[in-house]
Amino acid sequence: MGKKAVHFGGGNIGRGFVGEFLHESGYEVVFVDVMDSVIDALQKASSYTVTEISGEGEHKKVIENYRAINSKHNLDDVIKEISTADVVTCAVGPNILKFIAPPIAKGIDIRTQPKPLAVIACENAIGATDTLHGFIKDNTDESRRDSLPSRAQFANSAIDRIVPTQDPNSGLDVKIEKFYEWVVEKTPFGDVGHPDIKAIHWVDNLEPYIERKLFTVNTGHATAAYFGYNAGKPTIHDALKDERIRSQVNAVLAETSALIVEKHHIPAEEQHDYVQKIITRISNPYLEDVVQRVGRAPLRKLSRKERFIGPAAQLAERGQQVDALMGAVEEALKFQNVPDDEESFELHKILKELSAADATTKLTDLEPDHPLYPRVLEKVTKVQSETK
């Protein structure tokens, strides 16, 4: 019997990143989603194409050997697949983890496989697998919780690959950048050993990789998006052609680099080279990366452990400079009432209806006595005065 992976999330990251490498590693991939259109399309097609984009051109890969299940209508089938799978992965968004936990918990509970299930959440969030693990424990009978480690092992991961705006007529095919990084902690697998998945870089300590990625790639990308959007630039490439915006991105990443170098003992020269590589990647004209796509979901991106407040809070606690990060926060606060982005409308409502203090607390979860709080409050007050 061959290897099997169940993947929650039939979107672009699921098909064009996780699914691609599971397929290349010899797994049959079972996609699980609640979107009828995605599942119907996957069930009808025997393959789809992933197109990797780089400065050298395009490279196409055909993905086959997969199935798809609609968890909205066939949840029992999903549970059965999990019970006999080798790996479960997900790319659904951090807010959806609590909804996929119950079927995973049930699938784990009825497992009879000798080897524990490997569970890896592939989300843009720190400790996403730990979060999912907590929800799974909550959905496991108390009498069975102590034996959960014998049936499943949970490893956090950091993923990095840009998926630009897709052609609306592309169907299941995915256009994606050639560069990727998928780092997963190996310690949770112990003597059993980690699953054999191509592309994964297995490490003992994941935190430096997660924070370096989140506070460089995601912070830089979002900074370019918000400054670009407010300056009327259509794409990230166009935004970074503007010297004013490029210098703002560099200033923000100089601040986050100071944190990464000091906290994780990464050599300054290595971090500098990493930053330059990231700026080159996100400014790739072939990606046609639209600023609205990169800036979407501003409430999540302004939250406590995310790409702006996360590093800024740590820097403020260390007494270090956060001027450029606060400039990026101001631009993010202006990302309001953007078509097809529900959170941007909610942001407008919060800034319009709440006091500056209440809005600051709601958006960032910072306590008033935190050293970063007054800096954010100042930006919220300023944007509120400009918001109509």
UniProtKB/Swiss-Prot annotation:
**Superkingdom, taxonomy of origin:** Eukaryota
Q: What keywords are assigned to this protein?
A: NAD, Oxidoreductase
Gene Ontology MF term list: mannitol-1-phosphate 5-dehydrogenase activity
Show the catalytic activity: D-mannitol 1-phosphate + NAD(+) = beta-D-fructose 6-phosphate + NADH + H(+)
Presence of the UniProt keyword NAD in the record:
yes
This protein's GO cellular component annotations are:
cytosol
Q: List the disulfide bonds.
A: none
Quote the InterPro entries the UniProt record gives.
6-PGluconate_DH-like_C_sf, 6PGD_dom2, Mannitol_1_phos_5_DH, Mannitol_DH, Mannitol_DH_C, Mannitol_DH_N, NAD(P)-bd_dom_sf
Entry annotation: catalytic residues = 213
GO biological process terms, alphabetically, are:
mannitol catabolic process
The Swiss-Prot or TrEMBL record describes its family as follows:
Belongs to the mannitol dehydrogenase family.
Instruction: Give the protein's function.
Output: Catalyzes the NAD(H)-dependent interconversion of D-fructose 6-phosphate and D-mannitol 1-phosphate in the mannitol metabolic pathway.
Q: What name does the UniProt record give this protein? A: Mannitol-1-phosphate 5-dehydrogenase
Record organism: Paracoccidioides brasiliensis
